[in-house]
Regions:
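Histidine/lysine/aspartate-rich catalytic loop segments that bind and position anionic ligands
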Residues: 102-148
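Glycine-rich phosphate-binding active-site loops on the catalytic face of alpha/beta enzymes
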Residues: 102-108, 141-150, 183-204
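Short secondary-structure capping/turn micro-motifs that flank functional sites
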Residues: 58-60, 86, 107-108, 127-129, ...
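Glycine-enriched alpha-helix->loop->beta-strand junction motifs that scaffold or abut catalytic
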Residues: 44-49, 71-74, 93-99, 113-120, ...
Length: 213
């Protein structure tokens, strides 16, 4: 629970996460100008705190995580797309403090807890949200958020009662962040659209610079 509380507190300070997925060149160690690592370094320099690195069943994945950690020590790194016990094992090897899953899997969630890993489950339906709350999850990821709309969680609060804090993820851009936060979400996760071959989205850079502090 300490890791969960720490992540919730950190997201309260900066309610945004960037989700990245290294390609083969990144895994091979191509970390020069224009690389994913170079772009992450740029985001870290303007104050980004939270990055999820999409897990891959590749022995080079942990090495990439280590390089990001070394070059961008201010970033709080977690793993994205956790679906298997194999992925949990890699998470332990890398020593990452948290991971996100796109699905609600009670068996995987319990296994993560047994290994001291904070796994934030993905939820979509009212049933999944209620089950996650019953299992003691204080933080969940609504995925894909774009499919249900910004008011979805608010509409569930009356019939379901107290709910976990919610990260909105899936199909959202920088321009959506403020509306989803105002609707009561704890944070917003941004995916592939905020980093391309040209670098980080200038809108994201401005958002980070404006909210830094």
């Amino acid at each position: 629970m300490q890791r969960q509380e720490a992540l919730i507190a950190s997201l309260a300070a900066q309610p945004i996460l960037v989700v990245v997925r290294p390609d083969p060149a990144d895994l091979d160690g191509d970390d020069g100008p224009g690389s994913l690592l170079d772009h992450l370094s740029c985001l870290a320099s303007v104050g980004l705190r939270h990055v999820e690195i999409g897990w891959q069943p590749d022995g080079r994945w942990c090495s990439f995580v280590d390089r990001v950690r070394q070059r961008c020590p201010s970033l709080q790194l977690g793993a994205a797309s956790l679906l298997t016990a194999e992925a949990l094992a890699d998470l332990e090897t890398c020593g990452l403090p948290f991971a996100m899953s796109p699905c609600f899997d009670p068996v995987l969630l319990e296994r993560a807890r047994q290994h001291g890993i904070l796994l934030v489950p993905g939820v979509f339906s009212p049933t999944e949200l209620q089950q996650a709350a019953a299992m003691g999850c204080g933080l969940v990821k609504l995925f894909p958020a774009v499919s249900v709309g910004v008011d979805y969680i608010q509409r569930l609060r009356a019939p379901l009662g107290p709910l976990p804090q919610v990260i909105a993820a899936g199909g959202l851009g920088v321009g959506d962040v403020d509306a989803w936060l105002m609707a009561g979400h704890a944070a917003v996760a941004l995916g592939r659209r905020v980093i391309d071959v040209q670098g980080p989205d200038p809108t994201l850079l401005r958002w980070l610079q404006t909210t830094a502090g």
